[in-house]
Amino acid sequence: MEITFLGTSSGVPTRARNVSSVALRLPQRAEVWLFDCGEGTQHQLLRSDIKTSQLRRIFITHLHGDHIFGLMGLLASCGLAGNAQPVDLYGPPGLKDYIQACSKYSHTHFGNRVQVYTVEPGLVYEDEEFTVTCDLLKHRIPAFGYRIAEKDRTGRFDVEKAKSLGIPPGRIYGQLKKGETVTLTDGRVIRGQDLCGPTEAGRKFAYCTDTVFCETAIELAQGVDVLIHEATFAHQDAELAFDRLHSTSTMAAQVALAAGVNLLIMTHFSPRYAPGNPLDVTNLLQEARAIFPHTKLAYDFFNYEIPRHRSDHLVEVS
C-alpha cells in the first residue's frame, strides 16, 4: 500500500501544487485507487510513474470543483487509451448526475466501463482484501471522509512442522493455513494459528477532507496507520476556517491525537501560504507538531508506503 499525492493545494492550483488528488497503489493486485480528482489530475499522473491502465476505483469526497474537475478528462483519456478494466466511482449524491451531464453535453460515452455508486455513511466497498467505509464530515456541502482497512493476513504455514506432527497433507492443510482449528482422526485437536508464522496485521488509513474539526473524523481515523487530513489554514486564521468549514493545522493535529493514529500527513493548503508569504506551510507543520509530533507535510508527488505490522504468536505444538 503506497500513497502518492498528486495534488495538495486547496481551491486553486499554484505553481508548485495542483488541486486535490491522492493515489493509493496496490501492486499486489495491479490496481490504483484515486481519492478525489481535481483539475489536472491526469497531467499529474503522466508526470508520475503511476499507470492509468491500472486505475480501478475513484472515491470522491464532495462535489466542489477542486475535487472533481479532473474526472471527465481522466475518464475520457482512459477510454481513448482502450483501458480494459472498468472504473468504479463512489461519491455523494449528485456525482452520477454530474458525470451524466458532462457526458451528455461533451458527447463522451463510456458504455459499461464506468459505474457510479452513491455513498452513504457505512460500508462503501468490500472484497477479500479490503473494506472501505465512509461517514459525513462537516463542510458547506455534503462531504465524506473515507477509511480504508486492509484485512489481517495469516502468517506463513509451517509445512515441515505439520509433517513432524504426523498431519497428513491434503485439504486439511488448507484449513490450517486459514488459521482454522481441526480435529484429526486420532482425536488430536490442532489449531491452525499454532502452525502459522506471525500474523500480518492489516494496514489502515483515513482520508478526511474537506472539513472543519469534527468528531466524525476522529471516529474514521481511530487507530489508523496514516491519517491524511486537510489543513487549509494556519492557527492564526482559525476564524476563516470556522467561517468556511475548513481545518487549521492545529485542528488536524487534534484529530490525529484524539484518534491515536501513527502518522498524520497534512494536505490541502491554502495558496496564501506559498513560499515568500509571511507564513508558509513550514509554519503549519510547526503548529501541528507542537500537538502531534508525528506529522508530515504533503507535497505533489510525495510517496509514502504504509509499513506492515506483525504480531508474534507462533506457538510450539506438542
Curated annotation (Swiss-Prot):
GO terms for molecular function: 3'-tRNA processing endoribonuclease activity; zinc ion binding. Keywords: Endonuclease, Hydrolase, Metal-binding, Nuclease, tRNA processing, Zinc. It catalyses: Endonucleolytic cleavage of RNA, removing extra 3' nucleotides from tRNA precursor, generating 3' termini of tRNAs. A 3'-hydroxy group is left at the tRNA terminus and a 5'-phosphoryl group is left at the trailer molecule. Zn(2+) 1 binds at H62, H64, H139, D210. InterPro entries: Metallo-B-lactamas, RibonucZ/Hydroxyglut_hydro, RNase_Z/BN. The keyword Nuclease applies. Binds 2 Zn(2+) ions. It comes from the Bacteria. Homodimer. Zinc phosphodiesterase, which displays some tRNA 3'-processing endonuclease activity. Probably involved in tRNA maturation, by removing a 3'-trailer from precursor tRNA. This is Ribonuclease Z. It comes from Gloeothece citriformis (strain PCC 7424) (Cyanothece sp. (strain PCC 7424)).
